[in-house]
Regions:
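An acidic/histidine-cluster motif and surrounding catalytic segment
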Residues: 1-64, 68-229
Length: 229
C-alpha cells in the first residue's frame, strides 16, 4: 500500500510480541496493573518506534501499525498537505484511525475517551520526547507510574497530551487483533463499516472540507447536567 501511494520515507520497526512471552524482561519496576502481556507488547512497541523517530531531526512522525489501511485516501476530496495545513497549532497527537463502540465522529475533534485504536496517529517530536523520558529507561520500559485508566497504548499516548482525532484511515479486519480478538465483531466491525460508508458515499457529496478540519473547542467538553443552560 505504501508503494502504491509512492511513500518512500518510512522505517519499519519490529514489534515486541507479548502473546507467548509476558515481556517482564524488558520492563523496569512493577508489572503494570490490569494489563495483559499483549497490551504490554503493544505499548512498548510504540515507545520503541518513538525512540527510533527521535534519532531523526523530523518535527513529527506518522506512526502506523501493520493493520493500518490507508486505502480510504482514494476517496479524499483533499490532499494530505491540505489536511496538515489545518491541524491545530498546539497539537501533541492526531489520532487518524478510530474504533468507537458508540459512534465515530467524522469531524476533527478533541479525542473522546472511547476513541480507541493506535493503528495510525501523527505525533510531535516534543510529545514523543516526553513519553520516552517518562517511560524509557535505557533499554527497558517503565509502565508502573499509574497511567489512567491503564498504561495501554491508547491511554498512555493520547491521554498524556493535547490529542485530536479524525478517522482519515481505517484498519484491516482480516488481520484480527493480537490484543482483543473478541472485540473484532463487536466494536471493530461496526466502526469499520460506518467509516467506510462515510468515505465511499457521504464524502463524495462534500464540496468544502474546511468545516471537517475546523474543530469546535467546546464540543464534548461541557460538564454533565450543564447542557442547555
Amino acid at each position: 500500500m505504501l508503494k502504491y501511494w509512492e511513500v518512500e520515507n518510512y522505517t519499519r520497526i519490529s514489534a515486541y510480541d507479548g502473546r507467548e512471552d509476558d515481556l517482564s524482561d524488558i520492563l523496569k519496576g512493577r508489572y503494570p496493573d490490569m494489563m495483559s502481556s499483549s497490551e504490554v507488547g503493544c505499548t512498548t512497541s510504540h515507545l520503541k518506534a518513538m525512540k527510533e523517530f527521535l534519532k531523526t531531526d523530523a518535527p513529527c512522525a506518522l506512526m502506523m501499525e501493520d493493520d493500518c489501511d490507508i486505502s480510504t485516501a482514494s476517496y479524499w476530496g483533499f490532499t494530505w498537505k491540505d489536511f496538515y495545513a489545518k491541524i491545530p497549532y498546539d497539537y501533541d497527537v492526531i489520532q487518524l484511525a478510530i474504533i468507537n463502540p458508540a459512534q465515530v465522529y467524522a469531524q476533527l475533534h478533541r479525542r473522546f475517551v472511547n476513541d480507541f485504536s493506535t493503528a495510525c496517529y501523527l505525533i510531535t517530536r516534543h510529545h514523543a520526547e516526553k513519553l520516552v523520558r517518562l517511560h524509557c529507561k535505557g533499554e527497558k520500559y517503565k509502565l508502573d507510574q499509574g497511567a489512567k485508566p491503564r498504561a495501554v497504548a491508547d491511554d498512555l499516548i493520547y491521554n498524556s497530551g493535547n490529542t485530536f482525532a479524525i478517522p482519515l484511515f481505517l484498519y484491516k479486519l482480516e488481520l484480527g487483533s493480537s490484543i482483543h480478538d473478541i472485540h473484532i465483531d463487536v466494536f471493530h466491525k461496526s466502526s469499520y463499516e460506518g467509516i467506510w460508508q462515510f468515505w465511499k458515499a457521504q464524502s463524495q457529496e462534500v464540496d468544502n472540507w474546511d468545516p471537517y478540519f475546523n474543530y469546535d473547542p467546546y464540543f464534548g467538553r461541557i460538564p454533565p447536567g450543564f447542557e442547555g443552560k
